[in-house]
Amino acid sequence: MTDMNILDLFLKASLLVKLIMLILIGFSIASWAIIIQRTRILNAAAREAEAFEDKFWSGIELSRLYQESQGKRDNLTGSEQIFYSGFKEFVRLHRANSHAPEAVVEGASRAMRISMNRELENLETHIPFLGTVGSISPYIGLFGTVWGIMHAFIALGAVKQATLQMVAPGIAEALIATAIGLFAAIPAVMAYNRLNQRVNKLELNYDNFMEEFTAILHRQAFTVSESNKG
């Protein structure tokens, strides 16, 4: 027993316990791939949001900023995508010249809200999987452990004289399943909470930007309306 390592325990485990271990290892690999990918995407989203908002508040004209965004409209993300969607709808409704200022601003705000929801949906891709892994992996591992221990005691019942050396390898094989389940679950739960926290922070950032931009469009719409009346 002292010479056994984890690989030996895996190879000597029953077929079902081996299958459970492989499933949990697969969950762990998939979780780490998602953690790395989502972390990179959220880091990029935070940088892009900060860079665009710095540019937005630099005093640049909205029409010029819109033209710049229009030139790369297929690659827009985050705050810039929200801005582009809102200003595009604002310009379209304003040119129609058949809508009250309130309707123009409301239409632009609605377009920005839809765009923001799409951005958040993209940011949240695959994150729920981490929550699922964190929830079910310990139970899958526990099932493997229970099955392995049961299998070990059944085998033990077939011998006349039972000793600790006979049952210990079987129990150790079974407990490996629980260990792998925890190994898969703990990072997944921690990453799930952390990534959701970052998505919520970006959502608040987008929402604040949208409210501020809506206020600017509101002033602009009523200014143009008053000048047309005059």
Swiss-Prot record:
Tagged with keyword tRNA-binding: no
Cellular component per GO, a single term: cell division site
Membrane side Periplasmic: residue ranges: 1-15, 160-170
Lineage top rank: taxon: Bacteria
Residue ranges crossing the lipid bilayer per the database entry: 16-36, 139-159, 171-191
Primary role: Part of the Tol-Pal system, which plays a role in outer membrane invagination during cell division and is important for maintaining outer membrane integrity. Required, with TolR, for the proton motive force-dependent activation of TolA and for TolA-Pal interaction. The Tol-Pal system is also required for polar localization of chemoreceptors clusters. The system also appears to be required for the activity of several outer membrane-localized enzymes with cell wall remodeling activity.
Quaternary state and interactors: The Tol-Pal system is composed of five core proteins: the inner membrane proteins TolA, TolQ and TolR, the periplasmic protein TolB and the outer membrane protein Pal. They form a network linking the inner and outer membranes and the peptidoglycan layer. TolQ interacts with the N-terminal domain of TolA and with TolR.
Protein name, per record: Tol-Pal system protein TolQ
Biological source species: Escherichia coli (strain K12)
Source organism phylogeny: Bacteria, Pseudomonadati, Pseudomonadota, Gammaproteobacteria, Enterobacterales
